[in-house]
């Protein structure tokens, strides 16, 4: 079946077919090779892209900016302190203004409804840089990284996400694995697993793609024979440390440490993290947490020994954000 990604939004990957996702991954690999070889051709000359950031960012902002510059596009960075968004002007009105000025809009913020409103009213392609529900550009980078670190066909790769799984990472890793026919395990305390209705949507997708989906609180079941172990922070941006007590008690058994990695039974298992990671006390937040919870001084969701080991491929994952974001923009705008 033919497909066309021209002028397409990237909101969650729910509406992207497996073939379209694989095309974006292949394009990202081609663009990455071209950048390394010094043969990249700018295909977005004259394009202008607005980057709306309601949440702070390092990797997403840098990736969008470098990807755009590499391809000859211009960007404007917009944050809540430098615009009228949400103060004097609604997102709907903002969308209708920016859509007349820009060729595409990236949004990183809180509600999925907001990025969908931008897509509905702007009249230009909108790219989701992260919401509370989905993180599609991260998913493309994650799968590209797993492909690069595996000799297996895509549908034979086994990966587990472990920890607080009711967030954008848990949802998105379940969704993209279902779309691509992969062996996906989502593991965490029962109260921190993806919502049942979303799991049902992914299970319906898996019937078409042959994906194997496991959502469980059983760590040994989830990590057995895994090729890749993913995790994410246990606390969201802006949450007070005082609110961590119950969460930490729930999640401590799901911490990624040397023992958990050994429980996979795979000597070649790799560790992945969307970053930033709390793996030591070298940050202000890390020190505050260690002061309140001394048993976490050597790492929270992942321990220092795992993070600083050859198992960790999170920095290649971070680089691949840029290559996959570039692929999304080229496919939609070139």
UniProtKB/Swiss-Prot annotation:
GO terms for cellular component: cytoplasm. GO terms for biological process: arginine biosynthetic process via ornithine; citrulline biosynthetic process; L-arginine biosynthetic process. L-ornithine binds at residues 168, 232, 236-237. Pathway: Amino-acid biosynthesis; L-arginine biosynthesis; L-arginine from L-ornithine and carbamoyl phosphate: step 1/3. Its EC number is 2.1.3.3. One of its GO terms (molecular function) is ornithine carbamoyltransferase activity. The keyword DNA repair does not apply. Its main location: cytoplasm. InterPro entries: Asp/Orn_carbamoyltranf_P-bd, Asp/Orn_carbamoylTrfase, Asp/Orn_carbamoylTrfase_sf, Asp_carbamoyltransf_Asp/Orn-bd, Orn/put_carbamltrans, OTCase_ArgI. It is found in: Cytoplasm. The keyword Cytoplasm applies. It is an enzyme of class 2 (transferase). Keywords: Amino-acid biosynthesis, Arginine biosynthesis, Cytoplasm, Transferase. Carbamoyl phosphate binds at residues 57-60, 84, 108, 135-138, 274-275, 321. It catalyses: carbamoyl phosphate + L-ornithine = L-citrulline + phosphate + H(+). Belongs to the aspartate/ornithine carbamoyltransferase superfamily. OTCase family. PANTHER family: ORNITHINE CARBAMOYLTRANSFERASE (PTHR45753:SF2), ORNITHINE CARBAMOYLTRANSFERASE, MITOCHONDRIAL (PTHR45753). This is Ornithine carbamoyltransferase. It comes from Mannheimia succiniciproducens (strain KCTC 0769BP / MBEL55E). The gene is argF.
